[in-house]
């Protein structure tokens, strides 16, 4: 790589040139400088690859996979200028040779950089990934040997209608009952919550039959997801066909993962860890696709060896905002099943179901993790909203003809609106709503008529927060004319022009979202609040004062002074990432005027599946923008899938 350009530059000049062209960040250059200080003889190639590895983390990757990445064209979603290409290393074999012979690189984590096959890690990311893989392996080796007859009788009671067709909810409960970890994945409407409630009934009833009582903790990554699960679990527990004592022993309160692990202000560490584990026999985590590698490592570290972990989520949704795609990696082959014969026999014995169609093959072998993973395959909600379910499946299958057909076939629930950037159709849609899905005008009218009694304000606020979920505008982008920042500004200006909102920062009806955790207030990143008048005593007289109402996972309303909220933003529009864990009656997705690297199949699928009744696509460009997004899959570099399916083996003991 001794080009004329490079020979005239120092290694640092070359990195700075890449930074100035937005191919590296200041942080990436700083890491390379630090490594050069630690090892003055480090080569340019190794320093550059270290900087790129750091840069990859900003895009959600845990490592730099030298086998799958062509640096010149794929690291940044665009081709760098020709003069910059000369600064990049040559062939992958050359990179690997330089790394294998560098004192900065090892295979065991003793150096700042770790090379695992073709994957280059910063040491911390490698250590977290290894910790997660090892913890999963330990839980897979923890077997709960239940007599098949007892388990079968309990499953029959909880699933009395299981017939000739395989009941995958029943299969999921059976698999999760026999090991220290269970993974249940499925799309919206497949009954993930129903399954986990029956699993709780199954495990608690079996424990109480032995004069024990399981300590159960329920959690979700965000406050919104926790609140949704709290509501749905509370309703379904009462319908369980179990003894009253068992039903009373099943908790319905769901907390956030941060609260579960015990946040510590001004610290990235949690109160619960290996030396101070959670007091729980069973931990269930919903919306697990939102969990990044750091959080998963912290969760697993905080569990006692005997604690059973159940992960629940949709493997096809967007991966976590931070680095890693843990749920996607763990469930990568869930649609294939890959069940071994002993698992097939176990399900036949306990559920009476035949899952041999999902047996492993020589080309697709299944290891221990596959034996503890169940994919729910029946959409029970499709009768109520068939269009949304059909569109989601078509997007997930990357089937563009079926995507177009779904919009044509289900015009009552699916809509495509071509828009121009200079018209006001977007604002009109949001203000007026559609059908029985109320828009912003109705919301502001209700905000303008507060109750007269203080004791009525909590219920009023709860109703308004629910009304806020009637419709939600989403975008896959944060910046630019079609990103949430400018969309929120645009909608705010229109509300002001319509005399619905005054020209000031805080006003009744302004919805806001937390952009970072506030441990003192007990509010988490992603929590949504609504600015409302609240009747309070002031100078001995009742007065309406501006406050922000948040609904906590347990349903209580928390009123906060606007001045106490530092990290918030207006949220008439939110990113698709931030919408995860939420459900809206009517979801509207903005697509920009041209394809974008962030627009992927997973993003479109996640946006579609946020809608309960109605989905509207607002297209500022040609239909090809949607086509491009549906055909583009999200890929995150990591080694977890390889570790999970290559190195983990079935326990020597099994409860079959």
Language-model features, listed with the residues they occupy:
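Intrinsically disordered, low-complexity N-terminal extensions of AAA+/P-loop NTPases
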Residues: 1-84
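Residue-level recognition of short, solvent-exposed, well-ordered loop/turn junctions
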Residues: 304, 507-508, 524, 579
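C-terminal accessory regions
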Residues: 527-541, 545-648
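N-terminal pre-Walker A segment at the start of P-loop NTPase domains
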Residues: 152-166
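Conserved helicase motor core of P-loop NTPases
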Residues: 316, 320-512, 518-521
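Interdomain "pre-motor" coupling segment immediately N-terminal to P-loop NTPase/helicase cores
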Residues: 85-147
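Single conserved hydrophobic/aromatic residue that forms the stacking wall/gate
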Residues: 647-656
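ASCE P-loop NTPase helicase motor core
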Residues: 170-173, 179-406
């Amino acid at each position: 790589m001794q080009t004329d350009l490079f020979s005239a530059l120092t290694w640092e000049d070359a990195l700075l040139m890449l930074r100035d062209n937005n191919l590296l960040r200041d942080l990436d250059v700083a890491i390379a400088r630090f490594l050069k200080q630690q090892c003055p003889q480090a080569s340019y190639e190794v320093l550059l690859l270290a900087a790129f590895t750091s840069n990859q983390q900003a895009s959600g990757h845990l490592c730099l996979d030298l086998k799958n990445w062509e640096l010149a064209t794929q690291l940044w979603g665009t081709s760098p200028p020709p003069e910059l290409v000369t600064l990049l290393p040559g062939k992958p074999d050359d990179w690997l040779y330089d790394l294998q012979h560098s004192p900065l690189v090892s295979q065991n984590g003793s150096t700042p950089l770790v090379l695992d096959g073709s994957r280059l890690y910063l040491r911390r990311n490698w250590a977290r990934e290894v910790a997660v893989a090892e913890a999963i392996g330990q839980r897979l080796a923890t077997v709960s040997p239940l007599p098949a007859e007892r388990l079968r009788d309990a499953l029959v009671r909880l699933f009395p209608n299981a017939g000739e067709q395989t009941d995958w909810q029943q299969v999921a409960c059976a698999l999760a009952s026999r090991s220290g970890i269970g993974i249940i994945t499925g799309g919206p409407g497949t009954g993930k919550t129903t399954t986990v409630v029956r699993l709780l009934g199954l495990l608690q009833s079996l424990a109480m039959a032995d004069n024990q009582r399981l300590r159960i903790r329920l959690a979700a990554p965000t406050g919104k997801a926790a609140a949704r699960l709290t509501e749905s679990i509370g309703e379904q527990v009462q319908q369980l066909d179990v003894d009253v004592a068992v039903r009373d022993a099943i908790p319905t309160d769901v907390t956030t993962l941060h609260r579960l692990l015990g946040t510590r202000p001004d610290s990235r560490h949690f109160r619960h860890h290996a030396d101070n584990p959670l007091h729980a026999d069973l931990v269930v985590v919903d919306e697990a696709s939102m969990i990044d590698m750091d959080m998963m490592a912290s969760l697993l570290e905080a569990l006692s060896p005997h604690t059973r972990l159940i992960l629940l989520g949709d493997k096809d949704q967007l991966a976590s905002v931070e680095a890693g795609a843990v749920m996607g990696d763990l469930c990568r082959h869930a649609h294939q099943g890959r069940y071994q014969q002993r698992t097939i026999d176990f399900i036949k014995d306990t559920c009476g179901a035949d899952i041999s169609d999902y047996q492993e093959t020589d080309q697709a072998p299944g290891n221990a993790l596959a034996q503890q993973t169940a994919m729910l395959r029946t959409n029970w909600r499709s009768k109520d909203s068939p269009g949304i379910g059909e569109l989601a499946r078509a997007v997930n299958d990357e089937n563009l003809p079926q995507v177009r057909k779904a919009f044509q076939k289900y015009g009552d629930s699916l809509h495509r609106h071509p828009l121009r950037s200079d018209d006001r159709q977007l604002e009109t849609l949001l203000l007026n709503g559609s059908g029985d899905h109320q828009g912003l005008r109705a919301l502001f009218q209700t905000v303008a008529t507060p109750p007269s009694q203080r004791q009525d304000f909590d219920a009023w606020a709860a109703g308004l927060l629910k009304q806020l979920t009637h419709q939600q505008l989403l975008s896959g982008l944060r910046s630019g004319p079609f990103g949430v920042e400018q969309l929120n500004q645009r909608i705010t200006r229109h509300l002001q022009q319509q005399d619905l909102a005054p020209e000031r920062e805080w006003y009744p009806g302004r919805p806001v979202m937390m952009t970072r955790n506030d441990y003192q207030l007990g509010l988490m990143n992603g929590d949504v609040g609504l600015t409302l008048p609240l009747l309070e005593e002031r100078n001995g007289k009742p007065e309406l004062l501006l406050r922000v109402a948040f609904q906590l996972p347990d349903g209580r309303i928390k009123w906060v002074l606007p001045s106490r909220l530092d990290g918030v933003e207006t949220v008439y529009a939110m990113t698709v990432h931030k919408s995860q864990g939420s459900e809206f009656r009517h979801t509207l997705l903005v697509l920009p005027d041209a394809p974008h690297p962030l627009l992927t199949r997973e993003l479109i699928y996640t946006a579609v599946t946020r809608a309960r009744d109605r989905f509207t696509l607002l297209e500022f460009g040609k239909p090809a923008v949607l086509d491009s997004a549906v055909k583009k899959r999200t890929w995150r570099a990591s080694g977890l899938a390889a570790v999970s399916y290559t190195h983990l083996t079935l326990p020597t003991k099994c409860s079959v």
